[in-house]
Amino acid sequence: LDNRPVNDLRVEALADSTGMNVLLPPEDLYATRLDGQTTNANGTQYGDTHALLQWVLDNEDACDVLIVSMDQLLSGGLVNSRWEDGTDLTWEKDAIDTLSQIAARKPVYVFDTVMRLATTAGYQGLDSEAYRLFRSYGMAERGELTGHNLTVDNIIAGYPYGADGERIETTLDDELVEHYLAARARKLRLTDYLLRHAESFAACVVGVDDSAARIS
């Protein structure tokens, strides 16, 4: 997911305790840097997705099993997956296809997440108030979709609207809201594509981050 100790140091320690040898990419390739921290070598606050995929390819033969965070590989980390809003997903889909091909040769375990309600405070200029506002906005109940209406495109089209069909009100800047919704759309499309390849992998696990017990 990123370079927080629970995601790398503790994983290595746990593996060592069982006699397993874990290979991790250089930290600079997967580190998340908050505002005010020194950026990675690629000049960003997030991991280097292209370099990470190349690292996987270069080290495939040295591994018996691959365990891959899709948020890291496709978005440069969990935090950036809540911010990245690109619409051209050609490279990301090709990366999933590449993992599927590797999975035909050895076990590949992939882990993904459903994007949480809020963005991250202290990242890309967002603060705790933005976190609160985004969480409230994301928690608003949306309309229910069933049957043939339950499609990725329809889910995305409904993001700006509440269960009553009216646009959800917020004091957030319109540009920030559009960015947030675009990030959600991107994340959903990538998870949908991943799940369509789920049978290729030894396991495909999708975790649910901060969420609401309603259609949101």
For every predicted segment, state its role.
Residues 1-216:
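An N-terminal assembly and electron-transfer interface module characteristic of large anaerobic redox
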